[in-house]
């Protein structure tokens, strides 16, 4: 919706599953063979939305470990962009992935200098921070729509992509979705369900 380069949302649920307190499942419209830079950056934004939503709703001190999986996913994608895919102007089109194991800088005869290691980390952090700030901007800008989504998830627990569209537009749903949560691996986890009386925080 706000991130057109991301895969369409197939389903969102606040039902705990597989160690996650909820999940958003995205499915590509066709088999993906490659990533473009703008697509990868938007996926990082989508992945960081859970953490951004928690901070907006509960403040810096109210953030939980709920978005931990999202942060790991965003970090892995940002590292791939910088270290393997040549998507950093500063680092250049060099594959540093082989030297990443343990970040010792000396793996299989391939060395990475301290300066290069620091530059890689700076680029990875910059990509993640940029994604976080963009997710935060979207959530604040579209506060009304995402409050509707939060209430819809609280009421129905699981929503399909089509139902999510209806909910954020303020349209009534035809009936409950009794389909159990998909077993497909998730993209970002929805943050923890807050204490009674508070609405859950949706992701972008």
Task: Give the ranges of each region predicted by the language model.
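Soluble catalytic regions of large protease machineries
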Residues: 1-204
């Amino acid at each position: 919706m706000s991130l057109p380069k991301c895969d369409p949302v197939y389903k969102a649920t606040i039902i705990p599953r597989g160690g996650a307190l909820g999940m958003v499942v995205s499915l590509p419209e066709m088999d993906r063979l490659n990533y473009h830079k703008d697509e990868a950056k938007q996926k990082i934004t989508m992945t960081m939305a859970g953490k951004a939503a928690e901070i907006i709703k509960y403040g810096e001190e109210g953030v939980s470990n709920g978005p931990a999986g999202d942060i790991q996913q965003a970090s892995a994608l940002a590292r791939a962009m910088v270290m393997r895919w040549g998507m950093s102007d500063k680092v250049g089109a060099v594959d540093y992935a082989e030297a990443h194991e343990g970040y010792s800088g000396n793996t299989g005869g391939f060395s990475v200098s301290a300066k290069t290691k620091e530059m890689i980390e700076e680029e990875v952090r910059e990509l993640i921070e940029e994604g976080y700030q963009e997710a935060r901007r979207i959530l604040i800008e579209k506060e009304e729509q995402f409050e509707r989504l939060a209430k819809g998830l609280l009421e129905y627990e699981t929503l399909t992509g089509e139902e999510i569209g209806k909910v954020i537009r303020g349209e009534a749903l035809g009936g409950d979705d009794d389909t159990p949560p998909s077993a497909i691996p998730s993209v970002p986890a929805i943050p923890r369900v807050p204490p009674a009386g508070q609405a859950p925080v949706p992701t972008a």
